[in-house]
Amino acid sequence: MDSVTPNSRPESFPEFDSAGLAAAVDALAAQHSGREDMFRAAVVQLLKAELVKARAVAQAQLLKDRHGRRCAERLCFVQDEIIRILYAAATQHLYRSQVPSGAERMAVVATGGYGRGLMAPESDIDLLFILPYKQTAWGEQVAEAILYSLWDMGLKVGHATRSVDESIRQARGDMTIRTAILETRYLAGDRPLYDELVERFDTEVVQGTAAEFVAAKLAEREERHRRGGQSRYLVEPNVKDGKGGLRDLHTLFWIAKYVYRVRETAELVERGVFDAHEYRTFRRCADFLWSVRCNLHFVSGRPEERLSFDLQREIAVRLGYTSHPGMQDVERFMKHYFLVAKEVGNLTAILCAKLEDQQAKPAPVLSRVISRLKTGNSWRRVPESDDFIVDNNRINLAAPDVFKHDPVNLIRIFRLAQKNNLAFHPDAMRAVTRSLNLINTELRDNPDANRLFMEILTSNDAETVLRRMNETGVLGHFIRAFGRIVSMMQFNMYHHYTVDEHLIRCIGFLQEIERGGIDEFALASDLMRKIRPEHRAVIYISVLLHDVAKGRPEDHSIAGAKVARRLCPRLGFNNADTELVAWLIEEHLTMSTVAQSRDLSDRRTIEKFAAVVQSVEQMKLLTILTTADIRGVGPGVWNGWKAQLLRTLYYETEPVLTGGFSEVNRAKRITAAQAEFRNAFTDWPEDELNTYIGRHYPAYWLKVELPRKIRHARFVRASEDAGHKLAINVGFDPARGVTELTIFAMDHPWLLSIIAGACASAGANIVDAQIYTTTDGRALDTIAISREYERDEDEGRRATRIGETIEQVLEGKLRLPDAVARRTTRGKQHKAFSVEPEVSINNQWSELYTVIEVSGLDRPGLLYELTTAISKLNLNIASAHVATFGERARDVFYVTDLLGAQINAPTRQAAIKSALLHLLASDDTAAQPAA
């Protein structure tokens, strides 16, 4: 407690004249003698003006020296001085005690983050007013005078008033209050009263309760991470409360102060918890995070703790980052951020492991949080190696020089921990990080080291072990190409994690695929059992490396294939398997692109895809890789619709690769899908069921997943029973962040454009669309729009408005351009990005249609603009394939001219391309549809 010396002036902050301000307040007291309200108002006006000036100076200094901790110290110093001046004004000019008694004493104390002596620009102020006994009229008046003045200055203040006895009693029973008192710092008033609180807190609360406190703080940390997303590599991190953020450093220091009774982090070196290098790392991480946080508050003008996309670039510029080939300035900044978050995680792990190692009987929560293993007290040799021991269920070194005398041990230790289900002793973690210089060319080329690495990659719980290798730096040093993408973020809204975290997560999902039993991975799991045994290692290394060349000027798929050709022979792969890995990496986006943006019922599409994959075995491997890749992007990206598209593409292509396009095989799959559907509707009359099945074309039965088919059937039946010409069914998918609208109506040449326009008029952004026409001329379209409201009821009302708009347009009661003109502009997140517009037109993917593929920055109403523009170009849209990847929209249209022919004339294609490029490049300018 009280780690910042009162009245200490931060370096380079002479602009705030505390003594001059105090004298000015005294002068105001004389000027307004007997007029309390006028005196208060004058003091508030004076101090508020000085605070504004001081904040401006602090921000200017931050932009100049980029030192966030100094900025936080300056802001805290100013706030301290203001509170001291207010206390003096209250006790000397407003409520001077006429008959001082023992009860008329008070200490004003900073608590919480403010108590640490560091303050972000928009942070709250937490104050504790300490009294010797119960509250008195004098104490209440003084506290209120200070609080009301602070509130009148526009500051956010949290406060409590307690006696010393009350503080001690509440601290015993409330961990939040206990932590707040742990971080108290004296500001003004009766110093002996504060000292009494500190002394009694140490002897009556802290003593003998270290294990309880540590367990509670680690449980809080675990719950905070669970709420905010377990990974420290989420690409819009919370600087304060996120994993690897400032709160983790605070938790670390709370524990250190409580257990070791230290006041400064430097004392942890003397206690043997950190070495000098780790202490410097702690300071460096804290300084960086404070720089980010202070800039974040200044830029946003609010207590914003989330480093969102729309703020990241400005923060990067303020911190001096510049763009390099292959990496934007913002990506370099965020890479630094995630490297710091990784180091914070390492420091926390070291402290927690050290604590558990020193506790004879660690608390159950502590043991569970840190190791999730049973606690033992003996040590023994690790099987298979005399260089390592097991100490308290943690792997440790048998001698200090085990890495030096055999550098292969730097890989072996991870394999032994994996095989024996062991956590890492803190001394072993330190030894590993200090020995990274031993990972040189000789070790990288060592056959034993590479064999051990492949065993790690292809054995149980590879995700956990690879993450530990990554966090200690071993993975990036052993596979240098991987080291280049450690903590690298991609500045887009599609990827949820840094590149290295994405790859490691993909390995985890690959192992789930291999274990089987998960419906969403059914096809991939089935194929995993059918690939050649020698290709198991091929798929594992392909998954690990598929994005390893991100951030280079060259296309990452092509560059990644080159990396694989250099690396795989070292890892023990023969020439054929090396080429297979390179091919998988080079084509790892192909299957996803074809499945989501092409007409899978078009024979030409299937033949072109078959020409790419070349063999059933390669298609099996590519399907597995694609599944793991999409699933590893982030929550809600993989869904049943995408799984069904991959399944359809796989089974449509398989006959082509095994001796010709087999309609029999295809017919069997259609029959099987219809039989599966029949089994779900045993309560329907046979003739009604047959009629309904006959209303759908083969593509519907092959491409739509069973649960959706069931929902469609019930929806269509209910709509027709009710006699609705137009019906809309609303479904909610919070996991994907979308609301789905299924529209059943008579088909209409402009229906897709009308639906898109209606969504735009409601400010709804279309992120996915599944469009089908029945044999009797009805449209059955499912549109996924970005979720705007937290409550389903509010989303439902928005969907109702969209339905009403569609109906009014179809009935001629509403002009769609008028409705669209009032639509919402795109959100602030999208404004942070720029996407180069692209349009491609070709006749190679279809025998009957010209395929137009457009890609550009997504915005509300874009699909409406595109469909309208295409229709105005005298083109008929036969089918559309709509998808968004974060901020990027990628829409594909199968079109003909008005006579039903492909667009072959180069001049016509050029005109179409020019018109669509102009539309994509425009900023929220809607095309006007025909009347």
Curated annotation (Swiss-Prot):
Domain HD as annotated: residue spans: 499-622
Regulation: Uridylyltransferase (UTase) activity is inhibited by glutamine, while glutamine activates uridylyl-removing (UR) activity.
Cofactor(s) for this UniProt protein: Mg(2+)
Catalytic activity: [protein-PII]-L-tyrosine + UTP = [protein-PII]-uridylyl-L-tyrosine + diphosphate; [protein-PII]-uridylyl-L-tyrosine + H2O = [protein-PII]-L-tyrosine + UMP + H(+)
Region span, Uridylyl-removing: 384-739
Domain ACT: 740-822, 851-931
InterPro entries found in the cross-reference section: ACT-like_dom_sf, ACT_dom, HD/PDEase_dom, HD_domain, NT_sf, PII_UdlTrfase/GS_AdlTrfase, Polymerase_NTP_transf_dom, UTase/UR
GO molecular function, one term: phosphoric diester hydrolase activity
BP GO terms, sorted: nitrogen fixation; regulation of nitrogen utilization
Keyword Transmembrane helix (UniProt): no
SMART domains: HDc
EC number: 2.7.7.59, 3.1.4.-
Keywords of the record: Hydrolase, Magnesium, Multifunctional enzyme, Nitrogen fixation, Nucleotidyltransferase, Repeat, Transferase
Region annotation Uridylyltransferase: where it falls in the sequence: 1-383
HAMAP family per UniProt: PII_uridylyl_transf
Protein family membership: Belongs to the GlnD family.
This protein's domain notes: Has four distinct domains: an N-terminal nucleotidyltransferase (NT) domain responsible for UTase activity, a central HD domain that encodes UR activity, and two C-terminal ACT domains that seem to have a role in glutamine sensing.
Function comment: Modifies, by uridylylation and deuridylylation, the PII regulatory proteins (GlnB and homologs), in response to the nitrogen status of the cell that GlnD senses through the glutamine level. Under low glutamine levels, catalyzes the conversion of the PII proteins and UTP to PII-UMP and PPi, while under higher glutamine levels, GlnD hydrolyzes PII-UMP to PII and UMP (deuridylylation). Thus, controls uridylylation state and activity of the PII proteins, and plays an important role in the regulation of nitrogen fixation and metabolism.
Protein name, UniProt field: Bifunctional uridylyltransferase/uridylyl-removing enzyme
Organism: Bradyrhizobium sp. (strain BTAi1 / ATCC BAA-1182)
Organism taxonomic ancestry: Bacteria, Pseudomonadati, Pseudomonadota, Alphaproteobacteria, Hyphomicrobiales
